[in-house]
C-alpha cells in the first residue's frame, strides 16, 4: 500500500554550503541521485560522475550527490571537508548535498522515498553500498536503481540520460 503520492520534487534538502535546495526546481529534468563517500574503493567514480555531468548536464539532466558515512565509516569528513575534497580531487560541479544517512533509523526522508515502495509507489531498493545510483524521471517519479559498481558511463545510464532506454 502506498502511503502517499509524494514525488521526488516534493522534497527539499540542504547543500554542502548550508543552502536550502528545493527539488521542485528540478521539474522537467532527469535526475541521478548518488550516495557518495571520500574514502571508498569506488570514490574514483566521482571522476565519471563529473564527466557525465559535463557532457549531459543541462536543462534536461542533472546529478545530485549525497555524502553518507553509512558503510564502514568511509565518509568521515564534515560538510566543508567533503566540499574541499570533491573540488580539489575531482572538480565536482554537480550539486552536492550535506552529509546524511542513507539507511537505518536515521535515514534521510529523501532516501526513505528512494528505497521504499510504500513511499515511491514503484519499488523497494535498499542501498547496498556507496555510489548506488537512483534514476528519477522529469516528473519526479522513481525509474530505476543502478548498482554501486556500475560506472557512471555505463551503457544503461547513458541510454537513459539520452532517452534511448
Label each PLM-derived region with a short phrase:
Residues 48-51, 77, 81, 109, ...:
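Extracytoplasmic/secreted proteins, especially bacterial periplasmic and envelope-associated proteins
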